[in-house]
Amino acid sequence: MKNRQFIVFALLLACPLLLHGQETSLCGKESCNKGYIRHPWYGKKVGYIGDSITDPNCYGDNIKKYWDFLKEWLDITPYVYGVSGRQWNDVPRQAEQLKKEHGEEVDAIVVLMGTNDFNSSVPVGTWFAEKEEQVMAARGETKKLETRKRRVPIMTNDTYKGRINIGLSHLKKLFPDKQIVLLTPLHRSLAEFGEKNVQPDESYQNKCGEYVDAYVQAIKEAGNLWGVPVIDFNSVTGMNPMIEEQLIYFYDSGYDRLHPNTNGQERMAHTLMYQLLSLPASFLSLIHISEPTRQAEI
């Protein structure tokens, strides 16, 4: 078992070197050349749930989206359901549509949502409600009823955490054997889309007195509470429109410092490609160990 873990660990360490120059190193053949590793998400079918950052109609052809880069680099088939302006209470609807249209053929689902919940001042809320109940238990003696506190997830669209509970419960039930990956919301700065749509930068609280950090942190917590991997896009993309020099990654320094432009989307895609190396896209037999030779095929 230790040998197997060492082999897999060594292969993952080698991946950044093997992926240098995506077009030549990512193998799309039935069997990769010796010394090359197939990306675990190569050729997979992935559903994308989200808001304007994912929506193909947001700025149309003016912005090439992150999932489009992944299609190009990893031959991923994208099923895109993100819609501009949507919040976590729209996750069940998008998930239902994905299930209806692509059912069991989808391999994995990526969710990037939450920035509009912050902008709309949805209260963060709490994850659980607690109450005392009786439960049968035994610790070295005859089992008996004991009174203990029990927590149950709060399912409500009135709070951010309640919406996440509903959304992830829905996704887990619709796709119990599929990989589901959460991405934390990106940093945000000024967006001014008209007299009735002005969004201050993230140095300001929203109307319910919360900074965007609370909405990012909730996604991280949700990963542990629901057993879902989280990629901290807020951090690992390295993009922050609050830094003037980094506005090269955002659509317009004058009125839209919120949406990543094509350069920003490409950086998101690069980040996601490498982060996904550590996660299986599906839960079929990904690794086969030949005991006599102790060689791994991925």
Feature locations, PLM:
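Serine-esterase "nucleophile elbow" of acetyl-processing enzymes
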Residues: 21-84, 95-104, 244-245
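Single conserved hydrophobic/aromatic residue that forms the stacking wall/gate
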Residues: 287-298
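Hydrophobic h-region of N-terminal signal peptides that target proteins for export
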Residues: 12-20
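Glycine/Thr-rich phosphate-binding loops of Rossmann-like dinucleotide-binding domains
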Residues: 56-57, 87, 119-120, 190-191, ...
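Alpha-helical cap/lid subdomain in secreted, periplasmic
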Residues: 73, 94-284
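Short, glycine/acidic-enriched loop or turn micro-motifs at the edges of active sites
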Residues: 54, 235, 294
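Glutamine-centric residue-chemistry signal
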Residues: 5, 22, 94-95, 265, ...
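Bacterial N-terminal signal peptides that target proteins for export
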Residues: 1-7
